[in-house]
């Protein structure tokens, strides 16, 4: 059993195509991000998402752990249901993604072939030539909007032939 506060319940029940959450510290934005990630990777097997953060280091040390702890609470186990930062080993017998990443270093991969790429804004071009199915953007107040618009929004265009009927396909969750 998991407790959600009123603001979290409101956002989780809305489940909009595009959602923006501007909230103070301690609201529990990680649960909102984790729920969106779960909806997208489970309902779009083999999909490729993007998790945008100011820097990879900040994402891996501060942001991602608060999101992944919710997946753990919901029964998803690291190195069984998802793998962070490396290619899943063959003995897991996972499905393959529709588009296999060339580099697994900044990815979260899931048992059904879905992959979520950590997209860093500390270098330009980190989302160039990607075809993404959804975006989760954290720490929006630190995100360079021009870079986001010119690089990452353009990449949120993938796999229309597979997922066009899923309402969250090409959706965005923005938190700050």
Which sequence ranges carry the predicted segments?
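Phosphate/NTP-binding elements of NTP-utilizing enzymes
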Residues: 1-176
